[in-house]
Each structure stands twice: as structure tokens, then as C-alpha cells.
């Protein structure tokens, strides 16, 4: 995929990611226990009976919400000119890789909590998606607008 088709695909992907990050961020801050319980229920349905621990540490909730706001913002800025803001996709991939690997470490070292495994898989996939979009943005075939 090259040219205008690649650009349209990258823009669409970034817009969808921005919306999903915003929705998840709002859910994190509005109903953190509900998110954990729902995902734990799915884990139990799949055979993992270790429930996600609840937290009363509001600082971590605030930081998780802030992270979701930042990555949604990265997607919104990058989609405005995917050639010019292409490097932001590497920042997004780095953040998602850190989240994915951190979750894997908690899953392996702490407890086999389903949400840790799920976050490893989801954020790992999102990191790969960000790298793929970065690659596609490099195939658009026009110079970056100096702005």
C-alpha cells in the first residue's frame, strides 16, 4: 500500500486508536473496579480464576488516565499530517511496548492474573500496529510539510 491509500489508512487507524484510548481512559477513571471485575469475569470464563486485585491508590488511576489522554493526543496530532508527525508513532509504540512488557512481568513474577496477560497481548499488538502505521506513513511518497 502506497500513496494516498496508505495515508488514508494510517489516518483512519490513528483516529480509531484515539477514540479507543479515550474510551478506555474514561472507563479507567470512572469505573476502575468495574473494568477489573469485567475482565476478571472474562478470564474466569476462559479458565483463569485469579481475579485482578482492586486498588484504592488513586494516584495510579490518575496516572493511567493521564497516559491514555497522552496516547490519544499523540494519535490525534499524528493523524493531522502523518508524514510530518510520523516520529510520534515510534513514541506510541515505545509506550505500548513498555506497558505490554511490564504487564508480562507482573503476570510471570507476581500472580497469573488474566488482565496482566490480556494487557500484554493487547498492548503488544497495539505496539506492532503503531510500528506498521509508522512503516505505512513512510510509503506515502510526499515530503513532510515544514509547517
Describe every region a protein language model picked out.
Residues 101-118, 135-136:
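Membrane-helix boundary connector in multi-pass membrane proteins
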Residues 124-147:
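Membrane-water interface at the C-terminal end of transmembrane alpha helices
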Residues 72-87, 107:
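Juxtamembrane helix-break-helix junctions at the cytosolic face
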Amino acid at each position: 500500500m502506497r500513496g494516498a491509500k496508505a495515508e488514508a489508512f494510517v489516518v483512519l487507524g490513528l483516529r480509531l486508536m484515539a477514540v479507543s484510548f479515550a474510551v478506555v481512559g474514561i472507563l479507567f477513571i470512572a469505573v476502575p473496579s468495574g473494568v477489573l471485575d469485567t475482565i476478571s469475569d472474562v478470564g474466569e470464563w476462559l479458565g483463569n480464576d485469579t481475579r485482578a486485585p482492586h486498588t484504592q491508590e488513586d494516584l495510579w488511576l490518575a496516572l493511567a488516565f493521564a497516559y491514555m489522554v497522552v496516547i490519544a493526543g499523540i494519535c490525534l496530532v499524528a493523524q493531522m499530517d502523518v508524514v510530518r508527525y510520523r516520529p510520534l508513532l515510534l513514541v506510541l509504540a515505545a509506550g505500548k511496548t513498555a506497558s505490554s512488557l511490564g504487564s508480562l512481568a507482573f503476570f510471570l513474577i507476581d500472580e497469573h492474573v488474566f488482565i496482566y496477560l490480556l494487557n500484554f497481548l493487547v498492548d503488544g499488538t497495539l505496539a506492532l500496529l503503531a510500528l506498521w502505521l509508522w512503516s505505512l506513513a513512510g510509503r506515502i511518497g510526499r515530503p513532510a510539510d515544514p509547517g
